[in-house]
Amino acid sequence: MLTKKMITLTLAACLTSLAGAATAQPAANTFNFCTKKSGAISSGHVGAQQEKVIYGPYKVTCGTTSHHFNVKGASGQVPVIVQQLKNGGWASITAATYDPSGRFGAGIFRLVIDNRQSNTSVSYTGAFVVPM
């Protein structure tokens, strides 16, 4: 009889311990698994005093992961602008900068070279990593 009680108590203690460990884990829906897309930005050319979309538009539904861009020209890096579609128009969410990165939230985005202030054309190529 003592052996049955010991086994029952031991089994109950083990199950209670396991139940406590299971409830201490975060729920699966609280994890943030953002799919990322990466690739090359096709080589191209932006004429003098022109602006050109060089990547996008692309849609992000998971807004907690960073966007990363790297754009190079013949003589080094090229400043680019990240824009987001807001109220039916494109709004710049970064200033013209080299290799913009950041958590911009969810939405629809594009990457632009603004060459409107220059009298020389720019050639470019690049790469990206963006959340989906």
Give the location of each predicted region.
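Tight coil/turn sites that cap or link beta-strands
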Residues: 49-50, 58, 107
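Beta-sandwich interaction modules
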Residues: 93-105
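N-terminal prepro-regions of secreted/extracellular proteins
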Residues: 1-42, 46-47
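Hydrophobic beta-strand segments within beta-rich accessory/binding domains
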Residues: 55-74, 111-113
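Noncatalytic modules at the cell exterior or secretory-pathway interfaces
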Residues: 103-119
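Edge beta-strands of jelly-roll/beta-sandwich modules across compartments, strongly enriched
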Residues: 118-131
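Beta-strand-rich interaction surfaces with strong enrichment in secreted/lumenal proteins
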Residues: 42-44, 55-58, 99-102
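Short, surface-exposed beta-strand/strand-loop-strand elements in extracellular ectodomains
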Residues: 75-88
